[in-house]
Amino acid sequence: MSHHKKRVYPQAQFQYGAGVPPAGIPVSDASIIPPQVQSPQVGATDNMIPPYNQTPTMNQMEQAPQAQMFTPAQQQLNQQINSVTTNMGAMNIGTPMMEQMPQQMTPQPQMYGQSQGLMGHSNKPMNQLYPVDLLTELPPPIHDLMLPPPPLMVSPDKMLVPSETANASSDYLRCTLNAMPKNGSLLKKSKLPLALVIRPYQHLHDEVNPPPLNEDGLVVRCRRCRSYMNPFVTFIEQGRRWRCNFCRLANDVPMQLDQSFEGAPANRYERNEIKHSVMEYLAPKEYTVRQPPPSTYIFVLDVSQNAVKNGLLATTARSILDTLEFLPNHDNRTRVSILAVDNSLHYFSIPLDEESDQIRMMDISDIDEPFLPKPHSMIVPLNECRNNLEKLLTQLPEIFQFNIMSKFALGPALKAAQNMISNLGGKIVVVSATLPNIGIGKLQRRNESGVANTPKESTQLLSCQDAFYKNFTITCSKSQVSVDLFLASEDYMDVASLSNLGRFTGGQTHFYPGFTAANIADVTKFTKEFSKFLSMDLSTETVMRARGSTGIRMSAFYGHFFNRSSDLCAFSTMPRDQSYVFEMSIDENIGTEYCYVQIAVLLSLNTSQRRIRIITVAIPTTESLSEVYASADQLAIADFFTKKAVEKAMNSSLQDARDLLNKSLQDILATYKKEIVVSNTAGGAPLRFCANLRMLPLLVHALSKHTAFRAGIVPSDHRAAALNNLESMPLKYLVKSAYARVYSLHDMVDEAGYPDENGEIVLPEPINASASLFERYGLYLIDNSSELFLWVGGDAVPELVNDVFGLQDIFQIPNGKHELAIVEGSEFNERVRNIIQKVREHDDVITYQTLYIVRGPSVSEPVGHAAGRELQPLRMWATSNLVEDKVLGTESYREFLQTLKNKLNK
């Protein structure tokens, strides 16, 4: 028990949650646990894997392609698997019943993804199907949203060196189906999508948990399909050859595979490509067209009246100044340039520190044909010009403080910046508070009043207004230049047009609506995100290719990159905070027990190194539709549907996007009912689904209420920014963006808000995103991955108000963008601040979530009170995250499920 004493607030303890099951535990499931047998899947059975520390002898290797032999470790594991299977028979554990299973046999949600080690139709361990009734699982068990996907059931004997790292972690690569249909007709019949969710990098900085690196220059690849050697190949002919697991071709084993870097004998089974599915090569010369160029940053800064007036220019200059020492500069070659823009282009000639401290500004007013006055002094080495750069950044706000120009020539500035670094490549960083309104790429304010929330919204408000913003990205891709935008203004910015710059170059668009430097919360968010963005490691001259084994083909690609060919995605620079989705198709029957997918990323680092990152995954195959469903990954499927809906919203209409989401889900449920459910009863029939997919309807329902897709009038900049974010957002943040995580703070457990034994702040268990669980006297934190809302019940007792805010009257609580002030002597205030800080901690994205304090309505608040009217928009925004409810005129989740059931029973 914790030694911390829990403060009990009057009324707040004895009523809360009365009659409501804990989040994630349906009432009907509370005492039911499915059969538990340990799985032979690697990663779930650490104790079954013996140490592997010796090279197999030649007679232990495969003598011929048909006669595969195992290493000693594999033989031992095979024996253990057989023993487990035998024991299961003795324990009378059979395959879980299908839809005849009574409701009381529903497994606990935390067990859905746990394989029971039972043999599937192909006599190999497979995930088993556990049915649930969605309508009896209300509120939905949201704990499932934090569970890993159903495990990849790959027997250890299929790996050269069985280990936890032999198959790719779901952090790097997730497949929507962890049991691959053996033919296209079975995939089509299932109505489930087949796609990969790829996140090549897990952290903003590469030194955090890097994968193993091969530095000897040996890269072993298949002669035919060009896949890389991986833990799932087999050695044949006394180890002299290896059989490719992708195309089955026998390849010669190079002598260097059994030699160290110095040429001494070495154990091939200790090599990284054989032990680890995620690893890197230091690329040899044949993978390098030229010496990796220095990292180059060109800052295109809006210095027009808007940017000066709202403080964006001064905030940006200060942020760059403070972040110069954190710019990636591992090889001491990083270069920087600054281009100020209004109705003219203002270049700065920056001398080396040792030569002079006189910085010259050169104004080019001919924006139609801009030229570089002193090209060699425009882009300067950071190390050698550090003092002069700091001097310029300090003076920049003063130089333009009285600027009254309202024009912003972004198009000409982009062309000039691209011309400056066309030989090097690099990153153009645009910071703007003004709609481009002069020169090439000039944009107009669009009339939203008669178009928003109509079928024309996508074509007239969310489409690219000027072809320049798409065509320019082709030029950028050829010269290895990416574009990132930071748009911060109270005015219309046409995010829909400008976001194309980042979409096709590997960049990103960051949107700060209503920004003003007068609000410290706005400044804090911008500076923290801008600084993390600048300090983030990146890769230049990057290409990524996905390969599938025989029968599998990549068919569509989603994310921020330039698709050069049918399977090659090009990134002028690859950031560390984005993910990608590749759709796959099955072109021919798969005749093997397992299929394979490999992601290869060829890149240049800021260390002047050229590297190849390899991610390989093995997926069991099946001819059973029930096994396909039992191994489906609901979060990866939701991500894929999101990408398809974003595409539909931008190319067709928002209604079509919502229809796509709902129709996709309905087709899956209808197929499950028709093909998997054994017996049906009309009218009172339950809404059956498999446990591992039970959150998919909730996520689809939540996505239809997301700012990106929901019906109603949404400012086009906000909607375009939301669509842009969903395109590239890593999966775990996308899930929170769709279904917000809600914490009840007034009654949290004693340990919450304090550090645990590892120094990590303990968070309360999330509750369902529904106002029905909110008490009028409660305190709640809503986290939607972009913002935080601290909701104070309108009837909160004075003790709670005093402990949290240090105020005596609830009506004194500041509403809107505010940090939670420190209250001296209040332990509860410290705990709440600790929780907010913990929720904001991210080392894999640059997002810093602004906190909005919201006072809920009170029974004592006079009807029509001015304060209540002012708070209404903020309250509506906060409660729009409670997606299980009727928000903004939409169905509640219960009604949504009932509608689905009625459609399926027609």
From Swiss-Prot:
Keywords per UniProt: Cytoplasm, Cytoplasmic vesicle, Endoplasmic reticulum, ER-Golgi transport, Golgi apparatus, Membrane, Metal-binding, Protein transport, Transport, Zinc
Q: Per its UniProt entry, which superkingdom is the organism in?
A: Eukaryota
Annotated residues for binding of Zn(2+): C222, C225, C244, C247
- Xref: Pfam families: Gelsolin (PF00626), Sec23_BS (PF08033), Sec23_helical (PF04815), Sec23_trunk (PF04811), zf-Sec23_Sec24 (PF04810)
Q: Which InterPro entries match?
A: ADF-H/Gelsolin-like_dom_sf, Gelsolin-like_dom, Gelsolin-like_dom_sf, Sec23/24_helical_dom, Sec23/24_helical_dom_sf, Sec23/24_trunk_dom, Sec23_24_beta_S, SEC23_SEC24_subfamily
Q: Which family does it belong to?
A: Belongs to the SEC23/SEC24 family. SEC24 subfamily.
Instruction: Write out the function statement from the record.
Output: Component of the coat protein complex II (COPII) which promotes the formation of transport vesicles from the endoplasmic reticulum (ER). The coat has two main functions, the physical deformation of the endoplasmic reticulum membrane into vesicles and the selection of cargo molecules.
Q: What is this protein called?
A: Protein transport protein SEC24-2
Name the source organism.
Answer: Candida glabrata (strain ATCC 2001 / BCRC 20586 / JCM 3761 / NBRC 0622 / NRRL Y-65 / CBS 138)
